[in-house]
Amino acid sequence: MDIKERILELARQYHPYSIEQRRYLHQHPELSFEEVQTSRYIASQLRDAGIEHRQGVGGHGIVALVKGRQPHKRVVALRADMDALPIEEANNVPYKSLNNGVMHACGHDVHSASLLGVARILHDLRDTFEGTIKCIFQPGEERLPGGASIMIKDGVLEKPKPASIFAQHVHPPLRAGMVGFRPGMYMASSDELFVT
């Protein structure tokens, strides 16, 4: 079986797992810089999979390392945000937010659940690639000064230093199975701008 077939097979295998993770995270949202339980939960999932990780990076951030053959050869990072927004959920679904006035309205539950699934796939395939994949679970994306800058000050981009970082954001107008990308910065946030 070639690597593409193995990836597809593992993606099918972990699809129910990723849905389960997304629904759990959706049901238990936490605001920016308050992601205590979210961080613990994500760490427990990494631990259960046997994936090396470190908690408390820049507050509630987590960094996981999936080391392939020759782990120092090259390093690539994947990043997902994990905070929610101060919005009351109106959806009527079995996994509706249990935290009044807080919900995952921006897809960060999907981002974190997807990265958990990807980390497991990469862990299963670690004998097939060279280098290290650094999985970054970022707190505080929705609030200034932003969890990324705090994680950077706490050394997230060192030991090992990634040559590149990839992030994702769900985008409902794209059909399932499609990926949109462009060069340069592209992510948005709910920052406010005051013109005086």
Region locations from a protein language model:
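Acidic/His- and Gly-rich active-site-bordering loop/insert found
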Residues: I3-H104, A113-F129
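Histidine/acidic-residue-rich, glycine-tolerant segments that coordinate divalent metal ions
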Residues: L85-I87, N92-M103, V110, D127-T196
